UniProtKB/Swiss-Prot annotation:
Family of this protein: Belongs to the GHMP kinase family. GalK subfamily.
Pfam families cross-referenced by the UniProt entry: GalKase_gal_bdg, GHMP_kinases_C, GHMP_kinases_N
Source organism per UniProt: Streptococcus suis (strain 05ZYH33)
Molecular functions (GO terms): ATP binding; galactokinase activity; magnesium ion binding
Cell location: Cytoplasm
Binding annotation for ATP: 67, 124-130
Protein name per Swiss-Prot or TrEMBL: Galactokinase
SUPFAM superfamilies assigned: GHMP Kinase, C-terminal domain (SSF55060), Ribosomal protein S5 domain 2-like (SSF54211)
Swiss-Prot/TrEMBL catalytic activity: alpha-D-galactose + ATP = alpha-D-galactose 1-phosphate + ADP + H(+)
GO terms under cellular component: cytosol
Length: 390
């Protein structure tokens, strides 16, 4: 959707011109899965699929939201002074949460607004449509009300919304990748200190293919919070001898030495994934910087194996995509990305082999799962931004 289409769509819905238009990307994560809430490193990148917005300030206390993705819901009206979670308000709860926490942080949002939203991130795909929406609302509020915010402020508000308004105990990676993204750069982020580096994503003759299982995953209703609790319990058990805050502080040798302290086989597996995935992420960044794409690809594969066997968050659909991808010509590596339990995988594929890859993986997946996957070539692009002003 281009800027003119956005402006026209806003005019069609609300009968007035928008003050500004906006875009907030989705994200993929190259490696470093389920490490963000374990104090480890992640390596995400913002993509050109995302959420578009157009907005206009009102002079009363009414918020009016419309999504082209949920046309059947029509315009949802919300009282600016009653920003509480209400299931009936559907997707606008994300917007309400962001505005609530902005206000609580002392930012003056004294009138309502009208917001048109259109997203081309497949819903429930694990490409962070919710974090994309949170950051979109954040930059809309920043622009319309002249708020003085750093981008990190908005990233933290997005995470706060996810954790304390929506009720998902997620880490900061998604919002960070979406807020801080840059063209052709991946973000190497230490989720403990929030120190980060923009690393050039030079894959030579290879491209990143997003593989969508087309099996929707619901993060809040999944085993995501259970995995987090298992890791927190493992830290507690390790601290009978050690003194750590998170699993991300350990290397594999220290973990092996003290894993006997963890009293449950499943918790040992969960913790082992968190520790080793963090180490893989450190190695992957080094490999990428040295142009060693073969090693980078092997680490990506190893990440999936660990998520499948130790963290157990993949399932038939994601495993079929990854395992089939590994067998294809021109593939450096493939794995699930995001929280798992459905959603998407990524594959690093030679650009001349992309069509054959899609055909072969699609055919096998359809035979095994019973319906077709979708494929998109990911372009790595900048973070949430204003597209145009009136």
């Amino acid at each position: 959707m281009n800027t003119e289409q956005l402006k026209q769509a806003f005019l069609d819905v609300f009968g007035q011109e928008a003050d500004a238009t906006f875009f907030s990307p989705g994200r993929i994560n190259l490696i470093g899965e389920h490490t963000d809430y374990n104090g480890g490193h992640v390596f995400p990148a913002a993509i050109t699929l995302g959420t578009y917005g157009a907005a206009r300030k009102r002079d009363d206390q009414v918020l009016r939201f419309y999504s082209a993705n949920f046309e059947e819901l029509g315009i949802i009206e919300v009282d600016l002074n009653n920003l509480v979670f209400d299931k009936a308000d559907n997707w606008t709860n994300y917007a309400k949460g962001v505005l609530k926490f902005l206000k609580e942080a002392g930012h003056v949002i004294d009138t309502g607004m009208e917001v048109f939203v259109y997203g081309n991130i497949p819903n429930g795909s694990g490409l962070s449509s919710s974090a994309s929406l949170e950051l979109l609302i954040g930059i809309i509020a920043e622009e319309l009300y002249g708020l003085e915010l750093t981008r990190l402020d908005l990233v933290k508000i997005g995470k706060q919304t996810e954790n304390h308004f929506i009720g998902v105990n997620s880490g900061i990676m998604d919002q960070f990748a979406i807020g801080m993204g840059a063209d052709n750069r991946a973000i190497y982020l230490d989720t403990n200190s929030l120190e980060y580096e923009l690393v050039p994503l030079d894959l030579g003759d290879h491209v990143i293919v997003i593989m969508n299982t087309n099996k929707r995953r619901e993060l809040a209703d999944s085993k995501y919070n259970e995995r987090r609790a298992e890791c927190e319990k493992a830290v507690e058990e390790l601290n009978a001898v050690l003194n750590i805050q998170t699993l991300g502080e350990l290397d594999e040798w220290t973990f092996d030495q003290y894993s006997y302290l963890i009293k449950d086989e499943n918790r040992i597996k969960r913790a082992r994934h968190a520790v080793l995935e963090n180490q893989r992420t450190l190695q992957a960044r080094k490999a990428l910087e040295e142009g060693d794409l073969a090693t980078f690809g092997r680490l990506v594969n190893a990440s999936h194996v660990s998520l499948e066997h130790d963290y157990e968050v993949t399932g038939l659909e994601l495993d079929t995509l990854a395992h089939t991808a590994w067998e294809q010509e021109g593939v450096l590596g493939a794995r699930m990305t995001g929280a798992g339990f459905g959603g998407c995988g990524i594959a690093i594929v030679h650009k001349d082999k992309v069509e054959a890859f899609k055909e072969n993986v699609g055919k096998t997946y359809t035979e095994v799962v019973g319906y077709a996957p979708s494929f998109y070539v990911a372009e790595i692009a900048g973070g949430s931004r204003v597209l145009s002003r009136k």
